[in-house]
Design a protein with these regions (language model features):
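Hydrophobic anchor residue at the start of the ABC signature
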Residues: 142
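A short, proline-enriched helix->beta-strand linker immediately N-terminal to the Walker B motif
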Residues: 147-151
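Short helical segment in ABC ATPase nucleotide-binding domains corresponding to the A-loop/adjacent helical element
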Residues: 91-99, 109, 217
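The feature captures the beta-strand-to-loop junction immediately N-terminal to the Walker
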Residues: 41-43
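Conserved ABC ATPase signature
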Residues: 128-132, 136
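Helix-to-loop junction immediately C-terminal to a conserved catalytic motif
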Residues: 56
Length: 248
């Protein structure tokens, strides 16, 4: 790896409500290396998405700090829903982020269309979202994010709205795209299989308030696709270890 791109140092977060103070995150410490794919798993509602909001700077931690040791890091965010606008064509949807930032040029448009063609959507530029499959829509959402050339991708359960077969296929494709484009990724999910099949490391969070219970390095070749990983003995072993940790 090439050094830490992101560090969370003793990060805690409290919410103040009429009922009192609620602790959401407790003393989180971990880093993400440049070029690494890290997954965070934990029970639903444990604070995984809350952690992403701190990384993006939408909220500030109550204590501790989120740092970027190599300087400011351009980030992209991929959500559970694709949020494509139904009245815009695929090409115009993917250019939306560039439009909002007033960065649409012949060069940026050409680069974006090249990404669509490279990853199998070149024949659908004039199609509308309603004419696309769920997997195609979510892949378009990823390319919309990549069009802004982020260095760090934050993936917030990006496959959870899809059927199981599409999820498996799309995870393979998204993994390949992220590797091919040389991006760093932080995935949050409650799906253990998804985490083990895609990541270099898995961070296991406790129930709320989220603490880091365990960090597991996955001893599989970094470029092995997710579907191929699922057939290995190492996949079964890591899955069982994480499941055991979550049940404690």
């Amino acid at each position: 790896m090439n050094g830490a791109l992101l560090c969370l140092e003793n990060v805690s977060l409290y919410y103040h409500t009429p009922q009192g103070e609620t602790e959401a995150l407790r003393d989180l410490c971990f880093s993400v290396e440049k070029g690494e794919f890290v997954a965070v798993v934990g029970p639903s509602g444990c604070g995984k998405t809350t952690m992403l909001s701190l990384i993006m700077g939408l909220n500030a931690p109550s204590s501790g700090q989120v740092t970027f040791p190599q300087g400011p890091v351009p980030m992209g965010y991929m959500l559970q829903r694709d949020n494509l606008l139904e009245w815009r064509t695929l090409e115009k949807n993917v250019l939306l982020g560039l439009e909002v930032q007033h960065k649409v040029t012949e060069e940026s448009r050409g680069r974006t269309v090249a990404l669509l063609k490279k990853y199998g959507l070149g024949d659908f530029l004039s199609h509308y979202p309603g004419q696309l499959s769920g997997g195609m829509r979510q892949k378009a959402a990823l390319i919309r994010t990549l069009a802004l050339d982020p260095e760090l991708l934050l993936l917030d359960e990006p496959f959870s709205a899809l059927d199981y077969q599409t999820r498996l296929t799309l995870a393979d494709e998204v993994f390949s795209i992220i590797r091919a484009e040389g991006k760093t990724a932080l995935l949050v999910t409650h799906d253990i299989g998804e985490a083990v099949s895609m990541a270099d490391r898995v961070l296991v969070f406790s129930d709320r308030p989220a603490t880091l219970k365990r960090e597991i390095s996955l001893d599989v070749p970094g470029n092995m696709p997710p579907l191929a990983r699922r057939e290995t003995n190492a996949f079964q072993e890591h899955f069982a270890a994480i499941w055991k940790e979550l049940k404690r």
